[in-house]
Amino acid sequence: MDQANRKPEFRFEANEYPLGPGLRLLEASAGTGKTFALAHLVLRLLTEGGRQISQLLVVTFTESAAAELRSRIGKRLEDALKGLESFQHQSAFNSPDPVLDQWLLQQGSNSSKRNQWICSLLEALEGLDRADITTIHGFCRRTLRRQALESGAAVDPRLDRSEERRVGKECRSRWSPYH
């Protein structure tokens, strides 16, 4: 491919990515650090963004990916908490990666923010098991359950995998008034 037809490269900077309102899509090839980036963005949303873990929705494709995300987010929050606490006690903390080191240097020196963020991270870690870190299907299932009372739908909806049964029922409902 010649230079004229090349797409410009986008380098994702986890500490610079905007946190403003709206949807975010993180899309990249396998092994490029999506889980790492998401875990760091969750950290930033909980601290810099002032969000609570219950306000976030993290969706992926498979159960194993959701479990890995939950684990990595928890680890990231724990590492950030240790780093912020080391600033509080003026002791050295070597984080496991340069992105977290940079974040701690940029953000950790402000003592009023730091104390607030320590509390926020502790609360987030306590609520991590209940956080919306799920698959697309899990998100839909949970949304249907939450909306069941308002919509009058079943509280625990089941997916009808029988195409014939569904088509037959639909045909009978449409044709029965005429026969």
Spans of model-derived segments:
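Ser/Thr-centered flexible coil motifs
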Residues: 11, 160-161
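P-loop NTPase Walker
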Residues: 1-150
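Positively charged, low-complexity/disordered segments
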Residues: 164, 168-179
